[in-house]
Amino acid sequence: MEKKQNLTASNPETVTIFRAEYEKFLGQEQQLLSQNERIFRLENQVSVLTEALRLARHKQFGASSEKSEEPLMEQLSFLFNEAEVFAEVSTKQEEAVVVAAHKRHKKHEYTLDNIPEGIPTKQVEHRLEGEELVCPQCGDTMTEIGKEVVRTLEIIPAQTIVREDIYYTYACKSCSENADEGCETPMVKAPKEKNIIPGSFATPEAVAHIMTQKFVMGSPLYRQEQDLNRRGIPLSRQTMSNWILRATENYLTPVYEQMHKELLRREVLHADETTLQVLHEPGKAPQSESYMWLYRTSGDTNKPIVLYEYQPGRGAKHPEAFLKGFKGYLHTDGYAGYHNLPEEITVVGCWAHARRKFDEAVRSLPKGKAKGSSASQGLTYCNLLFRMEQEIADKTAEERYEERLKQAKPVLDAIFAWANSRTAAPKSALGKALNYLKEQWPYLTNYLKDGRLELSNNRAERSIKPFVIDRKNFLFANTPKGAAGSAVMFSLIQTTMENGLDPYRYLTWLMHTANHADLTDTQVVQSLLPWNAPAELYTK
């Protein structure tokens, strides 16, 4: 050892060579570590992009249904060690019946089209006459012995007629004959009907038709203009737009405001929002996004209300202002803006959104890799919760509350423990699903607090869908005033249909009645609400 130390000490060049090689080795090791880190990042990026590509392809070419292909109890096989948690769950299979060594799938039930009773009927009789009645055998005249009735359906396009109101003037003939003696001739004229839009030739029927074509059938005003022009009626889209806005402002807005007051008195609501492009929004570019907000009642009422509200942004201040005075539960999606509402509003999360994210994670996996994966397990947990809700749907609110504590609470505890035991790349589909579940957990479990609450916010999504579909036709609103008017129109029409009314007949009745009413009187406006409409306005 002493000899080796002496050798090193006597040869400083050797020390220098050893040190240089050592530093070179360290540099290569550091470079290798950096390359490995870069490879790891790139592999993760490729994995995320591949998932996104599979998901995009599925959305474009695959089935849109989120229904699971495996029966629920087969999906639950990975939970065999927690069987006591699910002991209350029904094991019946509704979609397939196992017979011998094969499966017999449930037949699809078709709804046969038919002509309902009560439709106006036109009878056309087909009889034989003259020589047609001569018997080909003996030449005698044949007599009627029976008939066959064949029912078919005729559809007559909307008819357009001109209504002429003729107001007669009356005078006293006797006074007229004695006019020379200083007798004035009194004249009386039949009182005029008040036009719903002064100075126009609009009628409640015409305006209601334009409204329902645009907001129920999704036919933009330019298409209605073309249709009217083909029938020889030169009615411009500008005129129709003005009619809608004037009628909305004068007759529909008071009813909308009263429904807003009624909405705030309810204890369970739903909310959602979607984008809308408004071309002439002050201080904003035409390409920027504004928002249509939706607020509606839940399934605990027989007087449903659906209200839309236009706002230029998506800030939390908008739902806070609209819901001022409301105290109760609000079903929402995971948007953070709802989480900053006043404390008297309890936000209830949406399990349909959580399930959708796990469903996307499953669909993003390579073919054959889904079964048994963490994404599939998360989806199975969500399916179990929805199955439980189906089984208690017909129970009272109090019974649902008790059943959820008994059945769903243990499942929720198991889901949370399972989610905390899983890891995934944050940007992967599974990572996003797990992150959503953990972040939204306090809101996702709030539905346990009251039996009237629902597992998802699908009720709001279904109500905002008509606007989303119509938006594909009209694309944008021209002005904020027009967007606000559209919100009132959608509100009246969707609330009308939810209450079982025919929107055209209701709007016609509403404008006829409101045209002669004092809309500053709350009781008068109350009488115009959809659930107070006459029975003949309801759909058959």
What are these regions (language model features)?
Residues 1-201, 241, 270-271, 404:
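Short, flexible loop/hinge motifs at secondary-structure junctions
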Residues 2-5, 19-22, 132-133, 143, ...:
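Catalytic center-proximal scaffold of phosphoryl-transfer enzymes
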